[in-house]
Amino acid sequence: MINEIKKDAQERMEKSVEALKNGLSKIRTGRAHPSLLTGISVDYYGAPTPLNQVANVIAEDARTLAITVFDRELTQKVEKAILMSDLGLNPMSAGTIIRVPLPPLTEERRRDLVKIVRGEAEGGRVAVRNIRRDANNDLKALLKDKEISEDDERRAQEEIQKLTDAAVKKIDDVLAAKEKELMEV
């Protein structure tokens, strides 16, 4: 009983940390990275299709992404999709290869991005605390139904608190790394 609650809480906390990492990877830093364009969909014969299924995206250098479109007719649609995204990027086409230069981030934009990143991290911490609360409520329900003793409940709550502290520390580490990456010029 108790082990199931702890295992469930741990899995959910790890998923929260992973979700935060994925969310932060989409926030643009000064460096070019193919994952910047993962959220972009292209209209492919009437169906929205992820960019990585119709083109190959690579980092050409620190400030340029190169996109090789598989189907020549899609080149303009890919360009349009990148322009329409809210990433503020200006693609330049050369045959089937589209180059996307990344403008350098201004100090003000970096600070805004750090605020956004901190907000995302706080959302992750709140999610982890909610998972802790749910697990503790499950333990209290077991105690109320006299399925576990008070000592077992207290011990389990302490272990869940340790899991929570570990997850929050992971979130803080991810946040610190992303802030450092954003503030590098």
Swiss-Prot record:
- Whether Endoplasmic reticulum counts among this entry's keywords is no
Q: List the CDD domains.
A: RRF (cd00520)
Gene Ontology molecular function terms on file:
ribosomal large subunit binding
Q: Report which superkingdom the organism of origin falls in.
A: Bacteria
Q: Subcellular location, in the record's words?
A: Cytoplasm
Return the SUPFAM superfamilies for the record: Ribosome recycling factor, RRF
Could you tell me the Gene Ontology terms of the biological process aspect for this record? Answer: cytoplasmic translational termination; translation
Does this entry carry the keyword Protein biosynthesis?
yes
Q: Which GO terms describe its cellular component?
A: cytoplasm; cytosol
Pfam families per the UniProt record, alphabetical: RRF
Q: What does this protein do?
A: Responsible for the release of ribosomes from messenger RNA at the termination of protein biosynthesis. May increase the efficiency of translation by recycling ribosomes from one round of translation to another.
User: Belongs to which family?
Assistant: Belongs to the RRF family.
HAMAP family xrefs: RRF (MF_00040)
Per its record, how is this protein called by name? Ribosome-recycling factor
Q: Write down the species.
A: Vibrio cholerae serotype O1 (strain ATCC 39315 / El Tor Inaba N16961)
Give me the gene this protein comes from.
Answer: frr
